[in-house]
């Protein structure tokens, strides 16, 4: 009776350990799949072209003065300020390492706002709106689908409207010639003869249509965008497109200019490649966190598997000895000892697959652009778990399969 109680107790301990190992495998496979997916998602985000030029684009604050013509100042001070600005422009124009440059308040990722525009049927659409100069489209290599980017403007109050493809679709236009839009509120305000004039509230023809690009994080997708294009800014940041491989030389020139004009080599600047990279800093952190936890889970599972298998296989030495006496080969013994763990891994995999798919779906449900889950990450996760488990078990199974039956039976 006592022997039966001991056997039952051992079986209970073994079953509880197997259940714990089963749970460990579910967590490990789950974390491994999530780690693989978020790594895939990060690679997808970084490798998908944003729709505009990113290489060699520098945003720099070179002019450290108030360029507002409404601010009162002495004529001598105004002339000195204008001379400094002209000198900076001259140096940039003469630099052989610069393809082109412009002054601009908005950049490809900054300076946008939301405005409500209406078409000729008064259909409203809240869309991202920028106020760039004509050079904006050329500098960022934005593709023009219809029309032309305007170059001539009669005055500072002369603005033209350009839409992207998504905005044309949102407004219900198939052709540029049919497209007319106006703003619900003034887009610009000018003063003429002492009176204030509000602009942009009357229907204006769309003069060009550009291809869509991603104005923010890729997962937000493309957005309807309007570009209110006017004369080139004489204020704002300097946006500089360098020739390939000449970024270092351009930076040296800019430091030299700042030293000559303001007696300092320090100025705020950022490369567009870095700005785009910063958009995905949280995605990098997420992928890194899941990778770390997946490695920890794998290590814990290996320890759990090692401890359980050490206990379990030693309990089966007598069974192994009898099977060897009855003619069981090494292959049969390997299958016998590994079969139980294969079932545990298989069961855990069956549970972890739908659970991981559901978690990925919940996390990415608001993403417009995302990497497909794909069967590949599940295959890789299963393969990794099998190889690691086999590596953990192989030494003990090999040792058990090579025992001397006579010694085991004699000890029994």
Region roles according to the model:
Residues 83-84, 88-96, 165-166, 188-287, ...:
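"Rare, low-scoring activations can occur
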Residues 17-41, 284-318, 346-347, 351, ...:
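Hydrophobic alpha-helical transmembrane segments of multi-pass inner-membrane transport and secretion
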Residues 297, 318-364, 379-380, 384:
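Transmembrane alpha-helical interface segments in multi-pass membrane proteins
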Residues 39, 43-119, 123-124, 129:
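Membrane-proximal extracellular/periplasmic loop immediately following the first transmembrane helix
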Residues 14-19, 23, 291, 368-395, ...:
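Conserved transmembrane alpha-helices of multi-pass membrane proteins
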């Amino acid at each position: 009776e006592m022997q039966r109680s001991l056997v039952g107790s051992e079986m209970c301990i073994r079953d509880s350990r197997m259940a714990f190992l089963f749970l460990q495998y579910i967590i490990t496979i789950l974390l491994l799949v999530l780690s693989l997916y978020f790594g895939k998602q990060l690679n997808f985000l970084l490798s998908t072209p944003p729709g505009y030029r990113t290489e060699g684009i520098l945003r720099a604050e070179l002019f450290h003065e108030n360029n507002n013509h409404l601010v009162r100042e002495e004529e001598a001070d105004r002339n000195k300020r204008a001379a400094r600005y002209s000198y900076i422009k001259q140096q940039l124009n003469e630099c052989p390492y610069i393809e082109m440059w412009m002054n601009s308040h908005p950049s490809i990722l900054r300076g946008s706002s939301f405005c409500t525009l209406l078409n000729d049927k008064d259909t409203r659409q809240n869309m991202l709106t920028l106020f760039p100069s004509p050079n904006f489209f050329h500098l960022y290599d934005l593709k023009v689908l219809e029309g032309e980017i305007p170059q001539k403007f009669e005055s500072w109050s002369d603005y033209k409207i350009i839409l992207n493809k998504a905005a044309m679709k949102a407004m219900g236009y198939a052709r540029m010639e049919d497209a007319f839009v106006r703003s619900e509120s003034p887009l610009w305000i000018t003063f003429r003869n002492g009176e204030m004039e509000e602009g942009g509230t009357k229907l204006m023809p769309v003069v060009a249509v550009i291809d869509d690009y991603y104005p923010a994080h890729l997962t937000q997708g493309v957005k309807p965008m309007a570009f209110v294009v006017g004369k080139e800014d004489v204020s704002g940041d300097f946006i500089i497109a360098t020739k390939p491989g000449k970024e270092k030389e351009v930076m040296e020139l800019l430091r030299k200019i700042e030293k000559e004009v303001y007696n300092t080599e320090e100025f705020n600047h950022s490369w567009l490649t870095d700005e785009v990279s910063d958009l995905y800093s949280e995605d990098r952190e997420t992928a890194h966190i899941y990778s770390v936890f997946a490695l920890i889970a794998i290590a814990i599972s290996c320890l759990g598997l090692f401890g359980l298998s050490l206990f379990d296989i030693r309990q089966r030495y007598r069974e192994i000895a009898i099977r060897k006496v009855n003619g069981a080969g090494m292959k049969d013994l390997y299958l016998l000892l590994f079969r139980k763990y294969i079932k545990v891994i298989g069961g855990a995999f069956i549970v972890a697959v739908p659970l991981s798919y559901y978690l990925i779906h919940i996390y990415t449900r608001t993403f417009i652009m995302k990497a497909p889950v794909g069967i590949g990450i599940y295959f890789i996760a299963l393969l990794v778990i099998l190889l690691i488990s086999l590596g953990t078990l192989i030494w003990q199974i090999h040792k058990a399969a090579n025992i001397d039956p006579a010694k085991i039976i004699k000890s029994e």
